[in-house]
């Protein structure tokens, strides 16, 4: 997690320019794990701290960068790509269908694209 100043650029080719000072989180997951590269340019979001956060810059093979704005985020905070998270405005949810709609595909393609590198957890195993 680091502060990106207004006007600074990040990512390959320095393609993303911050319009305001923002905390930016680097998340160790990318297209090799099943995050579609097209989310780079199609408004992809994840959940951190129970808020929707924009994926900024390019989805790379092993990481994404997420604009967290003014909110304080810390190393080790949970990041939800698909699923739900409690937040200050109630439960927020991102579904495979949300990404699919942005990418003009179907939810099954999103889910089937998640690679074996990503651990799977069921709600029951988390609660036990």
Name each region found by the language model.
Residues 1-128:
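Active-site anion/phosphate-binding pocket segments in diverse small-molecule metabolic enzymes
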């Amino acid at each position: 997690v680091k502060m990106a100043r207004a006007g600074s650029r990040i990512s390959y080719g320095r393609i993303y320019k911050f319009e305001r000072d923002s905390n930016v989180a680097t998340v160790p997951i990318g297209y090799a794990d099943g995050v579609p590269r097209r989310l780079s340019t199609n408004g992809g979001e994840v959940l951190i701290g129970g808020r929707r956060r924009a994926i900024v810059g390019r989805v790379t093979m092993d990481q994404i960068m997420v604009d967290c704005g003014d909110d304080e985020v810390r190393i080790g905070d949970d990041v939800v790509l698909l699923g739900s998270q409690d937040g200050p405005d109630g439960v927020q949810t991102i579904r495979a269908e949300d990404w699919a709609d942005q990418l003009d595909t179907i939810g099954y393609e999103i889910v089937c694209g998640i690679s074996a590198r990503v651990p799977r957890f069921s709600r029951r195993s988390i609660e036990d």
